[in-house]
């Protein structure tokens, strides 16, 4: 399903996007050395509930997961890159933490992710990975103009990731959003320009480049959700929800 939103609905989407951005910023500021991942999940749940929003994750039960996710936010640490299930773990100095949050406010979903170092980092490769995913996200967003194709976004993202020397996994990537969290079209993190679905004004897209330091292969934790790099190396992930408008892409989750 691909939904097309009118101008009034896009204004509601902006409110949803700003909410997600505010929650993620608050959680990033509160995530310190010693903070437990379960505390972060609790804080996210409190902010979602207080705003009258609806979590997209608590009841989320796709075919690739093991039952409902059951938490409000994904917390991926170090070699975990996607769908990190909050658990009893206290953050350590130098941990690379990714927070990925999706919620519906006023009936429209926004989805965003941010990676950052907890405390002080002694590993320049972490900073490079994070910065590379941010640049890839910027490139993908810049390519998301009305009339462009999904392949144009994918190619822009993949060009940045490949130039930095990172292998690219295409199993998981960006996606449409709207009244639900995961909609068509799928947006791989590499692709051929001029291919795929043509972008239309009124579409909402979640664009999310992610990388693992030296592999494109994933392994799944016993929890049935958390995806890690197959080699145990570190990972990074950046994501924004955008609207396609007549004037070009507009980032909603800021």
Residue map of PLM features:
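Active-site neighborhoods and metal-handling regions in enzymes and metal-associated proteins
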Residues: 1-254
């Amino acid at each position: 399903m691909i939904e097309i939103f009118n101008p009034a609905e896009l204004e509601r989407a902006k409110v949803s996007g700003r909410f997600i951005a505010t929650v993620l910023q608050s959680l990033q500021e509160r995530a310190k050395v010693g903070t437990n991942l379960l505390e972060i999940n609790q804080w996210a749940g409190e902010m979602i509930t207080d705003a009258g929003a609806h979590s997209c994750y608590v009841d989320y039960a796709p075919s690739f997961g093991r039952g409902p996710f059951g938490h409000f936010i994904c917390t991926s640490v170090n070699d975990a890159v996607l769908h990190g299930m909050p658990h009893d773990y206290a953050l350590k100095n130098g941990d690379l933490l990714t927070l990925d949050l999706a919620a519906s406010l006023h009936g429209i979903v926004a989805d965003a992710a941010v990676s950052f170092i907890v405390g002080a980092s002694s590993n320049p490769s972490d900073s490079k990975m994070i910065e590379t995913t941010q640049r890839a996200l910027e490139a993908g967003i810049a390519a998301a103009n009305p009339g462009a194709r999904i392949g144009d976004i994918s190619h822009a993202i993949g060009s940045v990731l490949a130039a930095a020397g990172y292998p690219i996994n295409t199993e998981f990537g960006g996606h449409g959003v709207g009244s639900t969290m995961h909609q068509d079209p799928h947006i791989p993190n590499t692709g051929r320009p001029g291919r795929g679905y043509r972008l239309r004004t009124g579409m909402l897209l979640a664009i999310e480049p992610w990388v693992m330091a030296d592999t494109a292969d994933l392994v799944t934790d016993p929890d049935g959700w958390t995806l890690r790099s197959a080699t145990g190396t570190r990972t990074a992930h950046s994501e924004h929800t955008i609207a396609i408008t007549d004037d070009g892409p507009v980032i909603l989750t800021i």
